[in-house]
Amino acid sequence: MGKIIGIDLGTTNSCVAVFEGNEPVVIANSEGKRTTPSVVAFVDGGERKVGDPAKRQAITNPTRTIFSIKRFMGENWDQVQKEVTRVPYKVVKGDNNTPRVDIDGRLYTPQEISAMILQKMKKTAEDYLGQEVTEAVITVPAYFSDSQRQATKEAGQIAGLEVKRIVNEPTAAALAYGLDKAHKDMKIAVFDLGGGTFDISILEFGGGVFEVLSTNGDTHLGGDDFDQVIINWLVQEFKNDEGADLTQDPMALQRLKEAAEKAKIELSSSTSTEINLPYIMPVNGVPKHLVKTLTRAKFESLAHGLIQACLEPCKKAMSDAGLSNSDIDEVILVGGSSRIPAVQKLVEDFFGKTPSKGVNPDEVVAVGAAVQGAVLTDEIKGVVLLDVTPLSMGIETLGGVMTKLIDANTTIPARKSETFSTAADNQSEVTIHVLQGERPMAAQNKSIGQFNLSGIAPARRGVPQIEVTFDIDANGILKVSAKDKATGKEQAIRIEASSGLSKEEIEKMKAEAEANAEADKKEREKIDKLNQADSVIFQTENQLKELGDKLPADKKAPIEAALQKLKDAHKSQDLAAIDTAMAEINTVFQTASAEMYAQGGAQGGAQAGPDMDAGQNAGQDNSKHGDNVQDADFEEVK
């Protein structure tokens, strides 16, 4: 039996691993790197480049360089409108209401672009193993819908791979982390914040059994969004300075994207970074430069809402698992965006423990996929993986209601049947409209397919008995059947993404030399002081907003005056004035706080002050609305 490779098909980067010599091995690509950028470029002469070579030429070829394609996988046109405006390449509406990438008039589906990345990973593994590879385990975000999972499987098929299993990314990470601990009894939380998606999964393992207790997340929250807040800030700064809009220039937009990503990465290890983009755009015929210093504190204030958006899925996952935070033995961080210090602090504060640093966030998912491949080939024995379906599945019934057959966090594989009936006399046909989501009404959930069951024997309303069966396989992919018990007639469909893909083979990709990057050193003391001032400004503004009317006007005025002094000192980079202003803010805040306590005005016992973290969760409605659908023509038999 040949090797089953494990592939982490990521939004920003991809990684491939294989189980060899009784351990999983991460395979370096032809550039010598263990991760490969999920970037595809179309260059002159019909050549395609994948990975680092594609990423390197993106600035000079922005409209034909494709990145973050994972965010379009398995989605319809209406669901990706925000993503379309963020990328410099052209995305258009294609067949079956799906998004397509337009390259010189040729429309590529997201599956085809993803297949080119998978082809690169396949070739990387083949070069390492010295043999052809035809089978793979591919990972997906835990919160991927049925259509997104099916699209991933199709991408594998186009790349010439038989996808033996689709595994949730946090589950794969837990498998890699716990392989040598499989016989210990542990409960772990996997916090996976990648380039485009966020997942939180709660798992329990012991005796070789890995069981997912719950999962939650957001398939449109990740590193791309953190990049975007930096891009938005740079665009606004340039507009303020020069009166021109950088988003109207695809090449400038691509340069902003790369600069924002680089700045974000540098701010995980530095407190400040300089963004220097010479000749970014001509204004009235004069070339203009964009040079800005971004501190970590400023970045965290820009990304505050995104960071806080990670909290609610964590709370929901813990609630669904029926556990308290103290029950968790270990917290595992996965995904490049989990390196952001503010994200790590949020995780530590929420779970009450320091996250484990024992895994590589960029590689652990691919390692887990390789472990699952070895389980399937019996190279690893005594390990059982019990995953769950992330979202509820059901059908539309009378009145546009969603009737659930399989609840979220049900262990898969799973099978469930329920009996329904007709909604009108002598009805000879019913439409089975299959839905996925947690909302009560069908129109509020995602439509993932529909089919008709015809030939029902004429009878009065409510008499026929239609048995609907949902069958979810180990990949989380759904098959639905409907059977008329009276006539025995049956109709079934395997829910698939409406991709309209042809199955032609994708040509192999070429790769070039590794990229080089440089970072300039900064004057540490000065940057630390500016960073501290930035942080105090942000926290002071936050607390003034929270205190609102509780803080009398005569107490608020000196605080606002001191705050303005600090802003002026920060702008002029006068370090002595910064120290004076910060001390003044601290003094006036403490005076106001003490007087509020004395007057009984303090609420909840929390002291206000610029040294405290006053960030609050940003309440967000993250519900995703599906397409409008017709009312069903049958009702549930009670």
From Swiss-Prot:
GO terms for molecular function: ATP binding; ATP hydrolysis activity; ATP-dependent protein folding chaperone; heat shock protein binding; protein folding chaperone; unfolded protein binding. Keywords: ATP-binding, Chaperone, Nucleotide-binding, Phosphoprotein, Stress response. It comes from the Bacteria. It holds the Pfam family HSP70. Induction: By stress conditions e.g. heat shock. The modification Phosphothreonine is found at T197. HAMAP family: DnaK. Acts as a chaperone. Belongs to the heat shock protein 70 family. This is Chaperone protein DnaK. It comes from Bacteroides thetaiotaomicron (strain ATCC 29148 / DSM 2079 / JCM 5827 / CCUG 10774 / NCTC 10582 / VPI-5482 / E50).
